[in-house]
């Protein structure tokens, strides 16, 4: 089967290639991801949930115990394991793009950035404030702004950028599904290299 043959179902044309959803906390990765997985006949995994299960504690507890560096090391190990599997839609943690080595695994799949404006992110995060250690403390809006400034250029290296606001998760999922065929490569085409 040829991955660019439009007569084949999209899930088959992907040939098990994983989809990695990247974007800021609150961008909708864990909401859109299961819809994509269902449409493609894939399995959905939330990387933060896998990390929590592996560590035996919550993400805030990992940050408190091991700091951000310890969390990023565990996140890297989980990504390395997940990249060995196939037919997954993975909602990654918002900071996964900040570790250059992670791009090697991410580039083995299709990287999709769910982009949300800063004001909308703040609104969403205020509505659901739990478990966000990087926003803890004084001035969460200032912290969010700083994280966005650092991460947006990294998110911009994704294969696909999708605005994830102003419509429901099912509409966002459908737009991603419509754009995926344009990202499929013919056999023998050069692979995208890590940044």
Curated annotation (Swiss-Prot):
Its cofactor is Mg(2+). The gene is aroK. It catalyses: shikimate + ATP = 3-phosphoshikimate + ADP + H(+). Catalyzes the specific phosphorylation of the 3-hydroxyl group of shikimic acid using ATP as a cosubstrate. ATP binds at residues 26-31, 132. It comes from Synechococcus sp. (strain RCC307). Belongs to the shikimate kinase family. Substrate binds at residues 48, 72, 94, 151. Pfam families: SKI. This is Shikimate kinase. Its EC number is 2.7.1.71. Keywords: Amino-acid biosynthesis, Aromatic amino acid biosynthesis, ATP-binding, Cytoplasm, Kinase, Magnesium, Metal-binding, Nucleotide-binding, Transferase. Pathway: Metabolic intermediate biosynthesis; chorismate biosynthesis; chorismate from D-erythrose 4-phosphate and phosphoenolpyruvate: step 5/7. It is found in: Cytoplasm. InterPro entries: P-loop_NTPase, Shikimate/glucono_kinase, Shikimate_kinase/TSH1, Shikimate_kinase_CS. The lineage of its organism: Bacteria, Bacillati, Cyanobacteriota, Cyanophyceae, Synechococcales. It comes from the Bacteria. Binds 1 Mg(2+) ion per subunit. GO terms for biological process: amino acid biosynthetic process; aromatic amino acid family biosynthetic process; chorismate biosynthetic process. Mg(2+) binds at residue 30. GO terms for cellular component: cytosol. It is an enzyme of class 2 (transferase). Monomer.
């Amino acid at each position: 089967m040829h991955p660019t043959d439009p007569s084949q179902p999209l899930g088959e044309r992907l040939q098990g290639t994983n989809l990695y959803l990247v974007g800021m906390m609150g961008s909708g990765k864990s909401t859109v991801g299961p819809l994509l997985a269902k449409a493609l006949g894939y399995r959905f995994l939330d990387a933060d949930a896998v990390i929590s299960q592996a560590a035996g504690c919550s993400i805030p507890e990992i940050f408190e115990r091991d700091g951000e560096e310890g969390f990023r090391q565990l996140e890297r190990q989980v990504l390395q394991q997940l990249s060995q599997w196939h037919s997954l839609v993975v909602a990654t943690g918002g900071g996964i793009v900040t570790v250059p080595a992670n791009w090697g695994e991410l580039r083995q799949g299709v990287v999709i950035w769910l982009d949300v404006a800063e004001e909308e992110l703040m609104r969403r995060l205020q509505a659901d404030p739990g478990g966000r250690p990087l926003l803890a403390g004084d001035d969460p809006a200032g912290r969010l702004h700083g994280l966005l400034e650092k991460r947006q250029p990294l998110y911009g290296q994704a294969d696909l950028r999708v605005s994830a606001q102003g419509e429901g998760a099912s509409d966002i999922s459908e737009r991603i599904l419509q754009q995926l065929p344009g990202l499929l490569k013919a056999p023998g085409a050069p692979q995208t290299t890590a940044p």
